[in-house]
Amino acid sequence: MKSITFHPKALAFIRSQSPTIKREIGEALRDVQKGISLGLPLSRPMPTVASGVHELRVRSATTVVRVFYFVKVADTIVVFHGFQKKTQKTPAQEIAVGQQRLQEVLHGHD
């Protein structure tokens, strides 16, 4: 089973969510750890962030949450950005923050 590494801000974001959202994120990441390939509607590739990045898509009755994760690191899943989605298209600002945080995690800076 793959290990998971979190950017500190992504972990704080996930911890701030409702119990329902946290449970769904946790269950989906556990499946990814086991090597299960998630597909739509739960996850989709996000090549606009970087090659190998996927967007976990979680919804409750009142909230839509997205979490970016990267799986092309040997035996590790990198969870590096999360945000509440309020528009149909992923905002450019969220993509830019995701790109920056991925580099921070991959190169050992927080």
Describe each PLM feature range.
Residues 67:
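Portal/gating segments that form or line small-molecule/metal binding sites
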Residues 70:
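Conserved Hanks-type protein kinase catalytic core
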Residues 1-64, 73-77, 84-110:
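Basic, Lys/Arg-enriched alpha-helical interface segments
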